[in-house]
Amino acid sequence: RDIQFDSTKDVENFLKDLVYSAAMVAAQAEATDTTPLIRLNGTSDILWEKIPVIRKGKEYANIFEAFPDVQFYDYTKIPNRKNIPDNYDLTFSYSGVEGYEKHIKKAKANKALKRIAVVFSHKERIPATFNGLPVVDGDDSDIRHKDGVNVITALYAKGKAKKDESGFVVHV
C-alpha cells in the first residue's frame, strides 16, 4: 500500500480503497472471532495518524479513529512521533549508522514508541540485553504489539542482510 500511496495522483480514491480494505479485514476478523490486525507501512514511514479518511460518509481524523476495534501496527524511523492513537502500535527501527545514537535516545524516551526493533547478524549470539533493555525474540511472527514494551525486539538478518555493513545489522 505504501508504494501505491506514494505514487498515486488520486489520493482520495486510494484512501477509499484503504478504508474498504480495512472494513473487509475487520468484518473477516469479526466473522472468525479474531482480532483484526493491519500493518499500513511496508517500506515507507507515512504518518497515517495525520491523514483524514471518510468512512460511511463521516470524516475521521485518521484511519485509526475510523476503525477503533482494529489493531494497527508499524515500524518507524521517526523517533519523535506524538499523539499516536491507542490502536496504533509503533516499533522504532534501530540503526547503527554513525550519528543515529541521538535518534535512539529520543525513541527510548518517547512513550508512543513501545519498543525498538534491532536486526542482529546471528540468531545464536543474540545478547540478553541491548542498549540497556531486555531482548525478546521477534522473528517468530510480525505481531509486534505482543512483544511488550520497553524491550528490544530481536530480528535476524536474512539473505543479503547477513552481509550488510551499513549499520542496519548489528554484528554479534
Predicted regions and their residues:
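Class I S-adenosyl-L-methionine
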Residues: 1-172
